[in-house]
Regions:
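Hydrophobic alpha-helical segments, especially transmembrane helices
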Residues: 3-4, 360
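Single-residue recognition of alpha-helix boundary sites
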Residues: 13-14, 167, 273, 365
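Hydrophobic alpha-helical membrane context
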Residues: 14-18, 78, 378
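N-terminal periplasmic/intermembrane-space "pro-region" immediately following the signal or transit peptide
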Residues: 1, 7, 13-45, 302-305, ...
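Outer membrane beta-barrel
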Residues: 29-52, 56-212, 295-301, 306-314, ...
Length: 394
């Protein structure tokens, strides 16, 4: 009898084995099936500022400098994003793209977004730890949103971003534009040390692009427009500015440096721009540089690293950070008086939680030999700025 029961048990196990294996295989197959996901996003920036001296465009006050709503969606290795912004009583298209992520090391993105160019490309416009993008970066147009196709590669010790760009939404919608700025660019980074608490990174980016062509341009030659406001959002006063007619192609190069150790970090870039000109006019050159020093005062005890963008990660909740920096820009060269600026600043950033942060900062910004300031300030002006920001995002 016992032998009979034993034989029946063995037979039952043998019969159930294939069904169990089939069930496990079916469960694994279901787990591997891609799923569609969708998530709303929102961002709000409330800024307040006091200026000394004030007047002539520098008016103390508060403003909602940026309101954005959007949606992100994903399906397997595919994902996309659409953001619509509203600020200063104007609607503006923000990020609009679709991307394919081959794996954790390679991705391809197509749409309207900020390309990988220089260290500033690692941080969104609203997440600059010094409130705003460096004046050098703004003046030379190093990190605008552009229509483009981008390929990114992120390896343990190397990062690379390659793009082809086809101008901005503003260029394509402007009157009399016959051809937008078209270019190619790349960012190349070497990071022999890149982990939480220790980063040593160097890199270089290069961008070569054509000018903007309009029907009104004489002899079919192109033009470039370079400008930067004083680094504050409550008052919008142009600090530097130059318009180049009879322009040829532009070359923009920026080496970068990022170092961090525990609660301290340093990041810096140098910019060099050269624009060829026609009709025997001399080439236009501009240059600039900035350096930021970071320190975590409370909360996190060391800086984290974001390998997918080759930059510092956002500090964690309940972390207080101080950032001090200096920015120099020289946009004046031969017959072009774009302006020369100096900017010194200190910012305190408190990351309350993953949805909310507060910033408080002081900066001294001065410009001279600037055609943009000629009418109101005789080409030269300085201002002290105390500003605060509450930022909400999810």
């Amino acid at each position: 009898m016992n032998k009979l029961l034993y034989l029946l048990s063995v037979a039952a196990l043998c019969m159930s084995g294939p069904s169990i294996a089939a069930a496990e295989a079916e469960t694994a197959a279901e787990a591997e099936q891609p799923r569609f996901s969708i998530k709303p996003t929102a961002r709000l920036l409330a800024d307040g500022a006091v200026y000394a001296p004030d007047g002539q465009g520098f008016t103390d006050g508060v403003t909602l400098s940026d309101i954005a709503v959007g949606v992100t969606a994903g399906y397997g290795k595919w994902s996309g994003r659409v953001d619509l912004g509203f600020g200063y009583f104007k609607f503006a298209m923000k990020d609009v793209y679709v991307q394919y992520k081959f794996n954790d090391r390679h991705l391809l993105r197509l749409g309207y977004f900020i390309q990988q160019f220089g260290l500033q490309a690692a941080y969104s416009k609203s997440m600059k730890p010094t409130f705003e993008t460096p004046v050098s970066d703004s003046y030379m147009g190093a990190t605008p949103r552009e229509l483009g196709l981008m390929y990114n590669m992120s390896l343990p010790c190397y990062f690379m971003g390659l793009s082809a760009t086809f101008g901005t939404i503003g260029d394509l919608s402007a009157e009399k534009v016959t051809r937008p700025q078209i270019g190619t660019l790349g960012r190349f980074v070497w990071r022999p040390v890149a982990r939480e608490g220790a980063v040593a990174q160097v890199g270089v980016s290069a961008w070569y692009q054509s000018p903007l062509y309009k029907r009104s341009n004489e002899d079919g030659k192109g033009s470039f427009n370079f400008s930067a406001n004083y680094p504050t959002r409550v008052a919008k006063v142009k600090m530097l500015g130059a318009t180049l007619q009879h322009a040829g192609n532009q070359l923009l190069v920026t080496p970068e440096l990022l170092l961090s150790y525990k609660r301290f970090a340093l990041q810096s870039q140098y910019y060099y721009m050269n624009v060829r000109r026609h009709r025997g006019l001399p080439a236009y050159e501009a240059q600039g540089a900035y350096v930021w020093l970071h320190c975590l005062l409370l909360g996190d005890s060391s800086y984290k690293y974001a390998p997918s963008v080759a930059g510092l990660a956002t500090p964690g909740p309940k972390t207080l950070e101080v950032v001090a920096g200096y920015d120099y820009t020289n946009g004046s060269h031969k017959d072009v008086h774009g302006g020369i600026s100096n900017d010194v600043h200190v910012s305190f950033n408190y990351y309350i939680n993953k949805y909310l942060l507060a910033r408080l900062g002081w900066r001294y910004a001065m410009a001279r030999d600037s055609q943009a300031l000629m009418a109101d300030f005789g080409g030269r002006h300085h201002v002290n700025i105390i500003q605060a920001r509450i930022q909400f995002r999810f």
